[in-house]
UniProtKB/Swiss-Prot annotation:
GO terms for molecular function: vitamin transmembrane transporter activity. GO terms for cellular component: plasma membrane. It comes from Escherichia coli O6:K15:H31 (strain 536 / UPEC). This is Vitamin B12 import system permease protein BtuC. Its main location: membrane. The keyword Cell inner membrane applies. The complex is composed of two ATP-binding proteins (BtuD), two transmembrane proteins (BtuC) and a solute-binding protein (BtuF). Belongs to the binding-protein-dependent transport system permease family. FecCD subfamily. NCBIfam families: PRK03784.1 (NF003001). GO terms for biological process: cobalamin transport. The chain crosses the membrane at residues 19-39, 61-81, 88-108, 112-132, 146-166, 184-204, 240-260, 274-294, 302-322. It is a multi-pass membrane protein.
Amino acid sequence: MLTLARQQQRQNIRWLLCLSVLMLLALLLSLCAGELWILPGDWFSPRGELFVWQIRLPRTLAVLLVGAALAISGAVMQALFENPLAEPGLLGVSNGAGVGLIAAVLLGQGQLPNWALGLCAIAGALIITLILLRFARRHLSTSRLLLAGVALGIICSALMTWAIYFSTSVDLRQLMYWMMGGFGGVDWRQSWLMLALIPVLLWICCQSRPMNMLALGEISARQLGLPLWFWRNVLVAATGWMVGVSVALAGAIGFIGLVIPHILRLCGLTDHRVLLPGCALAGASALLLADIVARLALAAAELPIGVVTATLGAPVFIWLLLKAGR
């Protein structure tokens, strides 16, 4: 038994090391890649200081943090709702953040500062997450809870479309592209949003014990002495914060929170002591690679990263649905 535990521990360490190496390689490639490729040897040249340190580095850090936040949010929501298909985009949390953002632009007539827009996006994400948690407490079946989340997402998407379609505001027209997901406008001015993600990410990665209890189910967690009300509300707040900040940084990006935790579980990373940091590393790597594809796919323009993640993630999602139905 002890030998099996040690083997599992070594395997977990190997997975985390491999994911760390993958993330570092993706980070280096992201700094090099672009319309003008700049190799590491030229990073400290005048051209490198402009393109790498002023343009690509803040974007790369934002992609890394958002990818980690979305993947961890997916893992947390799947444990919270006891639903393997739960994730921020599918359950409408990302769209809720978008509604909060667009409402702020409308009510503020485009005059609100960036920090206020970010807070409104966080508030929108929190509201949708709390509604979903209310549904979960009514002991809805997995399929009904999933449908409730999809319905909330459709309502939020419709509200955003109505607001954008009837608005004459240039800001809202630009938001229509932005809500498809993209890091094109990220620079060092958004560093406060990046910093707002770091403490919550680190804190959640350290909460493996309550997360493991929640993953056992509500009854088992209560029998083990976990204060469910406290942890549910704290994790809802943390998830809403991460999703809201991510939407404020890059718009709505789907499937990262769904696919990454599932793939890691299939690889044997079921313990949240390993799953949470693994999700952070794998989510960051996946979104970095998707961002590179979005930048390089077209010569004269940049694809919305949400399109890239949806194209890659939708087939995996269909496969997971088919597997769950067997």
